[in-house]
Amino acid sequence: MPLGERGGWERTESRYCGVETDFSNDVTHLLNFNISTGGFDYVLAPLVDPSYRPSLVEGNGVDTQVLPVCGSDLVLSPSQWSSHVVGKISSWIDLDSEDEVLRMDSETTLKQEIAWATHLSLQACLLPTPKGKSCANYARCVNQILQGLTTLQLWLRVPLVKSEGDSMDDTSEGLNDSWELWNSFRLLCEHDSKLSVALDVLSTLPSETSLGRWMGESVRAAILSTDAFLTNARGYPCLSKRHQKLIAGFFDHAAQVVICGKPVHNLQKPLDSSSEGTEKNPLRIYLDYVAYLFQKMESLSEQERIELGYRDFLQAPLQPLMDNLEAQTYETFERDSVKYIQYQRAVEKALVDRVPDEKASELTTVLMVVGAGRGPLVRASLQAAEETDRKLKVYAVEKNPNAVVTLHNLVKMEGWEDVVTIISCDMRFWNAPEQADILVSELLGSFGDNELSPECLDGAQRFLKPDGISIPSSYTSFIQPITASKLYNDVKAHKDLAHFETAYVVKLHSVAKLAPSQSVFTFTHPNFSTKVNNQRYKKLQFSLPSDAGSALVHGFAGYFDSVLYKDVHLGIEPTTATPNMFSWFPIFFPLRKPVEVHPDTPLEVHFWRCCGSSKVWYEWSVSSPTPSPMHNTNGRSYWVGL
């Protein structure tokens, strides 16, 4: 059964724990002992007798030899094979061996075992760790196999830290880091989404930053050795704080745990007292501890539960000028009370600065909400006036005729007819009867300016008095390089250029943030310069931490931070993000070809904001350590319409 219930999680979000076993001719007993008695969810078991070698069979001169598998497909039901067995490909295979017989035997065996696993309808098979300095032939053969697979997933076994006796660690610099081994193999297999990684977790762990890289990779399982466990005061197995944090991170990223190795904590009685004569699984105590770790993880918050379905799901950004928003979209944004509390605070400060206390009963402040939607900013502004005891006259300007209907009903229902004037018009083309003291808008996108706030406010600021206040007063975009294997494969699945040249709004989850974010473009309002130019260009350099090891950059995460007024800010940039706000997910700019980056070589990236007569678009490229093609030239794939 699954590891247990966790607060706020759906049943489909449960995690599972398997156990690695030796080869057995009696698969039924293997499942009974490890699943029915042991409590594990599945076995990671060899499918073929490890003594089998095709060349030895051929040498006997027998034409039709039966593959010495662990059991007929009939000994288990199809659902049992699929749900409770992960195939373990023979660990002796070495497709890059200089011994030609061994190499040929390895290739034949690999293909035979994968074919048998496919026949059994297994969900996954574990590939053994590459043994030499090169894995080119191994990867070539696996890539051939991947082309013919439909549902079977292949997990490549990779150690988190290589042991001293590991045959990989010859003098090859590229293999000093086990991530390099995985990256080399994955590149040779063309980033196939059916190829994932299973990490061997031993007693020694690399640095935190080195571990962090794996959170952006397609890790399907953590194979946890019994040697990694410590012993607590009562003699039971436990893990170090770092190991606990790592396993919790894998759980949070939907990876499974597999227990492997011999029991090193001899606490079990040979027979299960609850079932007389039944041998108890000696690895059960490790399963119990893993289940304990899962169940003690913090419950998901209400916001996290809502966002679960959006994790790593690519969405097209809004086109607010070209398209009118639907009621459901308005409803989602309006539920974000934190955002409107910040806007109310900003308006309160602006009103107090605009009108001194002694004139509060005399002066009426003219406030214009441009892009009023269904009225949340109108409400926040009127509440600010009430809190500060200031008189207010509001113009609510909205181009969406459907939202205007809701606005009229809101004004009538709240009795605001004498205070609020509704203007059904595009703010860029409206002629205001008077100038405003305060101009309020919520036109920001995930990247700040990506929903054309600069262009809209440039057109609207003619309403503003020379000493008027714009809320927001400024906003800045930020980017940071990320490893995002899932996002890259989702874009790649479209098999065209356009999707690699499109920016996506996405709730980032299975990503590794490789360096701190840096600012890109800043816009300030009001902007009374005689020649307004909203085109921008920025060159940035990012460096990986020295202890991180190399990493693969699949693209860039984008954020924004805005100053609403003075010290009131709003944003999603990770280090300054407004807590508990959900109106914006980050934006993702993919790279057509991922770039491998090393700690001693900076990543140099270029970003452009380009403006035409009818659209605005971004272009981006990498110039170091290896140049990438220019992305989205002339806005050929992705643009925002004016």
UniProtKB/Swiss-Prot annotation:
Residues 314-620 form the SAM-dependent MTase PRMT-type domain. It comes from the Eukaryota. Disruption phenotype: Plants are late-flowering. Increased alternative splicing of several genes, including APRR9. The keyword Cell inner membrane does not apply. It catalyses: L-arginyl-[protein] + 2 S-adenosyl-L-methionine = N(omega),N(omega)-dimethyl-L-arginyl-[protein] + 2 S-adenosyl-L-homocysteine + 2 H(+). Gene3D superfamilies: Divalent-metal-dependent TIM barrel enzymes, Hnrnp arginine n-methyltransferase1, Vaccinia Virus protein VP39. It is an enzyme of class 2 (transferase). The keyword Transcription regulation applies. Coiled coil: none annotated. GO terms for molecular function: protein methyltransferase activity; protein-arginine omega-N asymmetric methyltransferase activity. Induction: Circadian-regulation. One of its GO terms (cellular component) is cytoplasm. Keywords: Chromatin regulator, Cytoplasm, Methyltransferase, S-adenosyl-L-methionine, Transcription, Transcription regulation, Transferase. It is found in: Cytoplasm. A protein binds at F333, E442, E451. InterPro entries: Arg_MeTrfase, Arg_MeTrfase_PRMT5, PRMT5, PRMT5_C, PRMT5_TIM, SAM-dependent_MTases_sf. Highly expressed in flowers, roots and siliques, lower expression in stems and mature leaves (at protein level). Abundant in shoot apex, young leaves and leaf primordia, floral and inflorescence meristems, gynoecium, stamens, sepals and young siliques, but not in older leaves, petals and vascular tissues. GO terms for biological process: chromatin organization; methylation; positive regulation of vernalization response; regulation of flower development. Its EC number is 2.1.1.319. The active site is at E442 (proton donor/acceptor), E451 (proton donor/acceptor). S-adenosyl-L-methionine binds at Y330, K339, Y340, E398, D426, M427. Belongs to the class I-like SAM-binding methyltransferase superfamily. Protein arginine N-methyltransferase family. Methylates arginine residues of myelin basic protein (MBP) in vitro. Methylates symmetrically histone H4 of the FLC chromatin to form H4R3me2s, which in turn suppresses FLC expression to induce flowering. Regulates alternative splicing by methylating spliceosomal proteins. Involved in the post-transcriptional regulation of the circadian clock. This is Protein arginine N-methyltransferase 1.5.
